[in-house]
Structure formats: structure tokens, C-alpha cells
Amino acid sequence: MRIPKVMSTQHPDNVASPFFSTNVVLSGDDEVLEAFYAYSHLGCDEQMWDCEGKEVDAYVVKKLFTKHEEFFRENVLGRDLRLTLRVPNPEEEKAEAKILLEQLETIPRVFDLSKLFYGEDIAPIFEVILPMAKEADSIDRIYKYYMNYVVGKQNKATKEGDITIAEWIGEFKPATINVIPLFEDLEYMLKAPQILKEYLLDKEVTEQRVFL
């Protein structure tokens, strides 16, 4: 897997509004367009999609594919380019905790959309960023929740003797996701090696990114 070199972190404080924006405050379709320009004009190979502390467009992948089809046919989202969710930390942001669950549920949906678009199994979103990370358990809960509940429910039926959810709705992919801890406080930056060692103890991963 190719590691991205340049990430756009969504609308930093600018001297003036960008040329594509219809409002001073970027939101909705302006954020989708910003992501496209980050990829196509600025040469970024990764866009952070910030779900922390604000409303976010859950249909960003569909809008990118629909409005910029030719670009994303040539630049495969999930292979050449990445779209990475920054999710709320439930331990630190109680009022937004359930937004985390909402965003995890979108990952199999956009996988299905991508399969229709590219004709092969490519996950356009397969990583999430956990801000204010402090311990291995916080990272692991997201990893296990996605694997055991978001994807795991496909093997269950809504009632005894009925078909499984996968037979009813279709398979849920990808089977697992990567969770990127963002260590923001010096104390936890210094503990990052130990925290990651504990988190990875029961996992076989080919890559693990860490943000400081």
C-alpha cells in the first residue's frame, strides 16, 4: 500500500475565501469541491474529511464520482488517492460520540458505491483518525466496533429462522479498517511507542500510521 505524501486537512484559515466558495464559511458542496481541488490542483494525495465538531456531508464519495467522473476514473480513490475520516473521540467529546458510529456505518456503503464505479473491490475509505488519543483501548474500541458490529452484523438474522443480513442487504466490506491515533499532548506523544505496541498486539497489519 502506497503511503500518502501530502494531506489536505480541510479549509485552513485563509486571507480570503477560495475562488470556488459561495460563502465565507465553507460547508456542504463547497467542502466537496475543496477536496477535488486539493487532489486535482494542489497535488495532495490525501484529503482528511473532518467529522469532528461540525456537520459533514456523508455523500462526499458519491458527489466526487458524479461531478468529477473522468478525474476519478484516472485517479483511483482508495488506491492512488485517499479520503480519511477524522472522527470524534467518544472519551473526550461525549456530545458527539454517536457521530463516530454514524461515520463507521458509511464505510461499507461507499465501498458498494466504489465497486459499481470501478468494477472491482476497492475501499475508498478504509482509515479513520482518532484525535486526542491517549490509550490503546480507545484506538482498539473503534477497530473492534467496526469489525464486530458494523461488519459483524451481516452474519446475523433479524429474527430466528430468517435469512442473514448479508443475504438480505449484501456483504459488508471492507472487513476491517485502520485506526490512526492522533497524539496531541506531549505526555502521550512520548508514550506513543508503548501505546501502539499494546494496540497492535493482537493484530496482523501491513501498515500503521501515527499522527503527532
What is the meaning of each model-derived region?
Residues M1-D137, N148-T158:
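Alpha/beta catalytic barrel-like cores
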Residues V76-D80, Y118-P124, E167-T176, K203-T206:
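Short helix-terminating capping/connector loops at secondary-structure junctions
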Residues K94-K98, D137-Y143, L190-I195:
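A short acidic (Asp/Glu
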Residues L101-E102, Y143-M147, L196-Y199:
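Short secondary-structure boundary/capping segments
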Residues Y149-P174:
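Short mixed-charge
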Residues E171-K173, K191-Q194, E198-L212:
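Catalytic or ion-translocation cores adjacent to nucleophile or general acid/base/metal-coordination motifs
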Residues P181:
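Conserved, mostly hydrophobic/aromatic
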